[in-house]
Amino acid sequence: MGRFLLVTLSLLVVAFSLNGANNCCCPQDWLPKNGYCYKVFKDHKSWDDAEMFCRKLKPGCHLASLHSNADAFDFSEYITDYLTGHDHVWIGLRDTEKNYIWEWTDRSRTDFLPWKKDQPDHHNNDEFCVEIVSFTGYLQWNDDSCTALRPFLCQCKH
């Protein structure tokens, strides 16, 4: 009987830990997803200042990287619920070399690029950082001047 109880209890612990693994370590006002915690910050910062702010939160934090339509829809809903204005939002994608090769600050694969029509364009040779565009429901991206002041989306590893 004791062995049965121990096995049952162990299985329950494993089941609960797996069920809550996505939510286990994120602060209350952060969005848990795929082993990361995400938060949109309303403060308006340049892209570089936003990335530095995210990095200072704790090791493993950066401006967010998005890798699928599912990510885009989840973040669209989250940002729409959180932001009251119509501000575009910085994410962690940048063309550092100014050659249309876009890279994530977390060094993850650049495998999903839902650009707004006619973007990216490096307008006036000044747009090398990426924002999620508010009037597309936060579903499409635009390149903009890295000095523009925007709210931003951070991601941190659990």
From Swiss-Prot:
Residues 33-155 form the C-type lectin domain. Disulfide bonds join C26-C37, C54-C154, C129-C146. It comes from Hoplocephalus stephensii (Stephens's banded snake). Residues 1-20 form the signal peptide. Homodimer; disulfide-linked. The lineage of its organism: Eukaryota, Metazoa, Chordata, Craniata, Vertebrata. The keyword Secreted applies. This is C-type lectin galactose-binding isoform. A motif (Galactose-binding) lies at residues 119-121.
